[in-house]
A protein has these predicted regions:
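Short coil turns that connect the paired helices of HEAT/ARM alpha-solenoid repeats
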Residues: 40-46, 71-77
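A short glycine-rich, aromatic-capped structural motif
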Residues: 96-165, 189-205, 244, 249, ...
Length: 376
């Protein structure tokens, strides 16, 4: 049985804190930050604004103290403005410095995870339960593309890659579906869970961030990692979202089966729309992945949360825990990792906001990819 641990990285802070690491923050003493945060409660507008502007310029290194103030300050104005600043600092941090990735700020909040008792379709592994996401985070607005993956990992394993198509001597029935198309902006697929973990670490290293994972006893098949001992660390690096974070971000405040409302005929997402769903008429079926950013985003500015490729999450797959939960991370051990969102080759009922799938972490398919999260 595979086991992965979750540990808290013991980061040592010098007199001049630099939580952001690299060029993402300015060095400012904690006492100065504390004084500026107190100024957020000033009765004078100019003093509040000056403090807010200085804090925002410092960048990620203010987030730890801002989060404490937003939760614990006895001054309502300090709590209010600290929460606003957290959003602004995260928004400024929501751009990859080495790729063209853009990230949306997913503000902390509460939601009902799973499928409501009276909603169709509902499966036994989707029991509704209250969940609280206690810390705002960043999530990629799009799935990782073939171009981005190749830039970081120096290889493109995708089946739906135009470069693999059109070989008359050795036809590729998968790649030939996208012959003549520009596929660099299609989502990367044929990715194991371990490959996604390795990508997150490499991207963190490329940008001077602290990697979110350790990987030991690695087993490879060609360019892909099929097994490894993985430990999760609490750092500022890139990572996979948890299953709860993924659904919270996908729903964007909705309680309907899809973040765009009730079922449609395949016109709102890249999925198998040629099978009727509930009262929906049969619709179109593309039959392969499509460019990220196709269709409409949800209210949080996230594209393709339904369909296209199913997305790896951090968690081991298993039954939900009972009762309210804060920042759940899934079972402590297991044999399968969670994929979310459904894909181009499955019907709508498998692409709902609450749809979940357990897949062996070493498995690679042309309908599975991932998107990246980060917690500065």
């Amino acid at each position: 049985m595979l086991v992965a641990q979750s540990l808290s990285a013991n980061l040592v802070f010098a007199t001049f804190i630099a939580i952001g690491i690299g060029s993402r923050c300015a060095a400012v003493v904690p006492e100065r930050i504390a004084a500026l945060i107190e100024e957020l409660g000033s009765d004078e507008f100019d003093r509040r604004e000056a403090a807010a502007q200085e804090l925002e310029k410092v960048g990620e290194s203010v987030l730890r103290q801002l989060r404490t103030a937003a939760l614990e300050s006895k001054d309502f104005e300090v709590r209010f403005h600290a929460e606003q600043l957290i959003f602004e600092v995260l928004r400024a941090a929501g751009v990859s410095t080495s790729t063209d990735m853009i990230f949306a700020v997913i503000e902390r909040g509460e939601f009902s995870m799973g499928t409501p008792e009276d909603q169709y379709p509902r499966q036994n592994n989707q029991t509704p339960h209250p969940v609280r996401i206690t810390r705002s985070f960043l999530l990629g607005t799009h799935e990782v593309t073939q171009k981005q993956y190749e830039h970081v990992m120096k290889v493109n394993p995708s089946g739906f890659a135009e470069a693999r198509s059109g070989n008359k001597q050795s036809p590729d029935p998968v790649a030939d579906k996208v012959e003549g198309m520009e596929t660099t902006a299609f989502p990367v697929e044929q990715i194991s869970w371990y490959d996604a973990i390795a990508f997150c670490n490499q991207l963190s290293n490329d940008e001077g961030l602290v990697p979110s994972y350790t990987m030991e006893t690695i087993t490879r098949e060609g360019h892909s990692i099929t097994n490894a001992a993985v430990t999760s660390l609490e750092t500022n690096g890139y990572r996979l979202p948890t299953e709860a974070e993924w659904e919270f971000a996908c729903r964007a405040g909705t309680v309907t089966p899809f973040n765009y409302g009730e079922p449609t005929n395949g016109s709102m997402a890249n999925l198998k729309g040629d099978n009727s769903y509930a009262s929906t008429q049969e619709g179109f079926y593309v039959g392969h992945t499509v460019k990220v950013g196709s269709y409409k985003p949800n209210a949080r500015g996230l594209w393709n949360m339904h369909g296209n490729v199913s997305e790896w999450c951090w968690d081991w797959y298993g039954p939900y825990d009972d009762g309210p939960l804060d920042d759940p991370r899934g079972p402590a051990e297991g044999r399968q990792r969670v994929q979310r969102g459904g894909a181009w080759l499955v019907t709508e009922q498998n692409c709902c906001s609450s749809s979940r799938l357990g897949v062996a972490p070493g498995e690679r398919k042309n309908h599975a990819g991932f998107r990246v999260a980060r917690s500065p």
